[in-house]
Design a protein with these regions (language model features):
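Conserved catalytic or regulatory cores that recognize and/or transform ribose-phosphate-containing ligands
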Residues: 1-156
């Protein structure tokens, strides 16, 4: 199952944390696309914004699930956009199984009660997926969706 791993990528810590999580996903038979591990083509002369959009949008469109890192006082704006794109694509594509968000940041409290995270973005996640508090929970959910995808393929 192809998974798009959305999350903030602006600090060394953020990139290392996402890469570390991706290693665990791969060790569990999952196939995450991690944007910073997939560099843009050096001969592409378009603007950085256009290259980033095209590369990441294509990866989102090809993915069967999304994992979104939503730690911090606010959901990263790029991550929120990617969540919205995947949610919209899910409405017409039965091979897309859902969005699982990883929120293990105790500073922002519980997922549903008084949390300052954007309600619209959280609503997108909750309508088609789940918010997990640990990477282990994330892996369980992604494996369940992977099993569902395999059953769907066998039924065709």
């Amino acid at each position: 199952m192809k998974i798009y791993f959305a999350g903030p990528l602006f600090t060394v810590y953020e990139r290392e944390y996402i890469s570390k999580c991706a290693v665990s996903l791969r060790e569990n038979g999952l196939h995450p696309f991690v944007p910073h591990e997939n560099p843009m083509k050096p001969d592409d002369t378009r603007s950085l914004a256009q290259r980033c959009l095209d590369k990441d949008f294509n990866a989102i469109a090809e993915s069967n699930a999304m994992l979104a890192l939503i730690n911090g006082p606010e959901i990263d704006d790029g991550t929120a956009c990617e969540i919205g794109i995947f949610y919209a694509l899910m409405q017409k594509d039965s091979t897309k199984k859902g969005i699982v968000a990883l929120h293990d940041d105790w500073r922002t409290g519980g997922v549903s009660e008084g949390k300052p995270l954007n309600a619209f973005v959280v609503g997108c996640i909750e309508k088609v997926g789940v918010i997990c508090n640990s990477l282990e929970e994330v892996i369980q959910q992604l494996n369940a969706w992977s099993d569902d995808l395999q059953k769907d393929r066998e039924a065709r």
